[in-house]
Amino acid sequence: MAARIVFAGTPDFAVPGLDALVEAGVRPVAVFTQPDRPAGRGRRLTPPPVKRAAERHGLGVHQPERLGAEEAEQIRALAPDLMVVVAYGQILRRNVLDVPRFGCVNVHASLLPRWRGAAPIQRALLAGDEQTGVTLMQMDEGLDTGPMLARKATPISADETAGSLHDRLARIGADLLVAHLPEILAGAITPEPQPDDGVTYAAKLTNDESWLDPTEPAEQLERRVRALAPVPGARLQLGETPVRVLAARACAGRPEDRAGTVAAVGSGGIEVATGEGRLEITRLKPAGGREQTAADYLNGRRLVPGEPVQ
């Protein structure tokens, strides 16, 4: 396919889209991604995943702090037919949106207009949504407000985590992009305006939202654990030890349970009494320690029913 494509993306979610374009014979004339950032315990300067993927494919990489007037002219000089944007991390302004012949299209990890914004995967899990999907959208200057080109739905399973859903939606998005690219470049798709009904926003999760509140119902806490797994993990003070809860399930409680205490411990996990039912923790990571099963954790620490959890 002899098309001049500019690709813009940054995290792991965007890599399958870039890979799919190259595998389909569409080598972007340029890749834009965020600058290298300090990461990890040593705060070493680390390239974003899209940069590593682009270099693996031998593609030219640009890493501006923002897409300003100078960058818009750089893109214009590339004479692109289309700009493909996947989790780039910036809202594009009109001076960029108007440059490509067929504009800019975005791969978004929700069924728009539900969950516009930065954290659609986590918000869908927190809300207990039964399905989500990917929307291919013609970009405008708003926050995920542009008209839709295509959508693909997928169910959310009962044990879905943010990690597993992220990987599946990234693959769905890549396939959706490649499947509809010929129509987009032929001007053969009529964009469909997003409906006014059903609009919700997916703000980034705050630090406070990572804490589990044992006074909430167990089902709600389980959703929070899954929405924060595997990274960064839901936080909890288990007795005297702060931990990250990586896997848990809601189960039935007992009349004598006191919310915010350890209800039971055993080979299956650590059961915490909540506002409604119990939360059985099966995998966790203590502060400064390694990820482990609850059984392994109990082998090295004494935890008894009645201890406080907060």
UniProtKB/Swiss-Prot annotation:
It catalyses: L-methionyl-tRNA(fMet) + (6R)-10-formyltetrahydrofolate = N-formyl-L-methionyl-tRNA(fMet) + (6S)-5,6,7,8-tetrahydrofolate + H(+). It is an enzyme of class 2 (transferase). Its EC number is 2.1.2.9. Keywords: Protein biosynthesis, Transferase. It comes from the Bacteria. Gene3D superfamilies: 3.40.50.12230. One of its GO terms (molecular function) is methionyl-tRNA formyltransferase activity. InterPro entries: Fmt, Formyl_trans_C, Formyl_transf_N, Formyl_transf_N_sf, Formyl_transferase-like_C_sf, GART_AS, Met-tRNA-FMT_C, Met-tRNA-FMT_N. One of its GO terms (cellular component) is cytosol. Disulfide bonds: none annotated. It holds the Pfam family Formyl_trans_N. (6S)-5,6,7,8-tetrahydrofolate binds at S110, L111, L112, P113. Attaches a formyl group to the free amino group of methionyl-tRNA(fMet). The formyl group appears to play a dual role in the initiator identity of N-formylmethionyl-tRNA by promoting its recognition by IF2 and preventing the misappropriation of this tRNA by the elongation apparatus. PANTHER family: METHIONYL-TRNA FORMYLTRANSFERASE, METHIONYL-TRNA FORMYLTRANSFERASE, MITOCHONDRIAL. Belongs to the Fmt family. This is Methionyl-tRNA formyltransferase.
